[in-house]
């Protein structure tokens, strides 16, 4: 098929011979775009008659659907993993160290920045040590972030460059660093990259997003993640993929909240404002000790007073607030604070801010109901469950089978009216939205699954809603909506079954429920993106 630029201002382009995913016309085979807006949806013959002067594009049976939004990413860090040392696919310590040694030989004059190792996938389950890195990299400065980016292994040469590292909480001379020690180390290693190097990484990440049918990403930045300089540079980057930034720094009062937003350019003071860490690094804050480390309940990064002050300040200022919460103790601390703020200022004042919680892996039914009543958005990553869920996964190792199989309860959240926005947390998990949708529909705890249709909505409309777009059409293919869509090569489409207790609809083709690609366990390859368009402009393909 031949593609041209989408319709210029005042002219129209008519896509025909397609399979169009539209709630307004489930059997549609054609879509007209005029400028940056979808102007019509229907069938081929009617489209030709309605738009006789339009440029015709024959899609030869391709699938046209709303473009995706990734509601939680770290753009520069993702780019560094794409153009640098990616360890996310290694399955043994020896393989990891061999790859590090080869990279060190090929890149002799730079700090080595790597990402993605996960010792829970290795035969002995032991993390990397300082001595092993020193040997493999021949004494070079090395920073290797664990897959969850809440701990990192580092060589002696890099450790010696960081003032005060040995005195920081979370330091160990041989094992990966966590907490304050890791934040010091990461900031120092990040400083070794030039502005040009950071720009190259960003472009690689945003290009990758566009190639996967993603037109908008939510950057979750903060002082302890990428730093203010990188955050501002990213928001100023010119690229077809839209970037909405959230800054993770606590506000003391409403004036301070406004000052932080003005200073950073952020859409809200949310995202990765850490209340705790991650389960893989045993830094998520739990009510009960870890099953495989009974001496610890993880780490708390913010106390209750700071959490409540932040929520109160942002609510009074009308600014979106949010936190990174994974462990049940962290989740409880934030939800309790939300309740007190709602009592003080009223539920409508809280709900209109669109506060959001990232990850939200351990949440009870009562807590989910409270979040639904307060209009709090759950920005979640279904691929976490695909990677680490189930009775034999890392979650079960860390928490035991009972607790470990109750994480990421997507169906519970949806049933309680909690708006879902799906993301990848890239580079933690792959930035492939069809992987995300499939993971949500095939949860390793089946009762926590949502339907493919609901998952697709959370990966498209859900992301727009989470960033404050409430027009009712953005994220859909409906006349009058912005022309943000992707064209996919895929096999048969199916009407997926609903999830009892969440949504119900008929799977009869006569019911006019729009069909989606087959994402069942036995399905063929995932859809391949042929073209991505945002606001009428082609950004990929």
What is each residue range found by the language model?
Residues 21, 438, 445-446, 451-461, ...:
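C-terminal cap of metal-dependent C-N hydrolases
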Residues 238-272, 354-361, 365, 393-418:
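Phosphate/diphosphate-binding loops
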Residues 264-266, 371-379, 416-419, 442:
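Glycine-enriched alpha-helix->loop->beta-strand junction motifs that scaffold or abut catalytic
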Residues 319-328, 380-382, 413-435, 480:
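Short acidic/histidine-rich active-site segments
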């Amino acid at each position: 098929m031949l593609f041209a630029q989408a319709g210029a201002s005042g002219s129209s382009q008519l896509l025909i011979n397609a399979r169009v995913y539209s709630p307004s016309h489930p059997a549609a085979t054609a879509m007209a775009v005029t400028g940056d807006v979808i102007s019509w949806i229907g069938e081929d013959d009617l489209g030709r008659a309605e738009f006789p002067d339009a440029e015709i594009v024959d899609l030869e049976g391709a699938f046209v659907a709303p473009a995706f939004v990734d509601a939680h990413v770290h753009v520069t860090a993702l780019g560094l993993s794409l153009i640098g040392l990616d360890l996310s696919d290694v399955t043994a310590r020896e393989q990891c160290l061999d790859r590090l040694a080869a990279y060190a030989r090929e890149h002799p004059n730079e700090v080595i920045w790597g990402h993605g190792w996960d010792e829970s996938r290795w035969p002995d389950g032991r993390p990397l040590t300082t001595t092993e890195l020193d040997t493999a990299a021949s004494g070079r400065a090395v920073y290797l972030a664990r897959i969850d980016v809440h701990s990192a292994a580092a060589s002696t040469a890099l450790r010696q460059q960081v003032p005060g590292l040995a005195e920081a909480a979370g330091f160990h001379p041989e094992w990966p660093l966590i907490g304050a020690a890791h934040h010091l180390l990461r900031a120092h290693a990040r400083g070794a990259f030039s502005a040009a190097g950071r720009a190259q990484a960003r472009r690689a990440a945003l290009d990758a997003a566009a190639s996967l049918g993603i037109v908008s990403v939510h950057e979750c930045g903060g002082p302890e993640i990428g730093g203010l300089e990188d955050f501002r540079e990213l928001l100023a980057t010119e690229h077809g993929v839209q970037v909405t930034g959230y800054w993770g720094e606590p506000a003391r009062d409403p004036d301070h909240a406004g000052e932080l937003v003005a200073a950073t350019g952020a859409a809200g003071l949310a995202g990765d404002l850490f209340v705790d860490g991650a389960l893989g690094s045993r830094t998520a804050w739990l009510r009960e000790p870890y099953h495989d480390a009974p001496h610890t309940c993880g780490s708390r990064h913010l106390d209750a007073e700071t959490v409540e002050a932040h929520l109160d300040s942002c609510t009074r200022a009308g600014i979106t607030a949010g936190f990174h919460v994974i462990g049940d103790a962290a989740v409880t601390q934030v939800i309790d604070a939300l309740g007190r703020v709602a009592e003080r200022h009223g539920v409508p004042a809280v709900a209109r801010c669109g506060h959001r919680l990232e990850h939200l892996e351990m949440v009870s039914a009562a807590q989910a109901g409270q979040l639904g009543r307060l209009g709090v958005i759950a920005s979640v990553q279904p691929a976490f469950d695909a990677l680490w869920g189930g009775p034999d996964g890392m979650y079960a190792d860390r928490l035991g089978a009972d607790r470990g199989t109750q994480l990421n309860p997507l169906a519970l959240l949806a049933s309680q009216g909690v708006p879902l926005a799906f993301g990848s947390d890239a580079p933690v998990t792959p930035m492939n939205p069809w992987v995300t949708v499939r993971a949500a529909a095939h949860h390793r705890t089946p009762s926590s699954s949502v339907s493919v249709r609901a998952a697709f909505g959370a990966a498209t409309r859900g992301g727009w809603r989470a960033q404050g777009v409430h027009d009712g059409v953005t994220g859909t293919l409906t006349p009058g909506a912005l022309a943000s869509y992707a064209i996919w090569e895929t096999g048969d489409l199916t009407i997926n079954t609903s999830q009892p207790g969440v949504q119900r609809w008929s799977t009869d083709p006569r019911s006019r429920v729009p069909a989606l690609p087959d994402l069942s366990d036995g399905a063929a390859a995932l859809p391949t993106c042929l073209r991505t368009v945002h606001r009428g402009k082609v950004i990929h393909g």
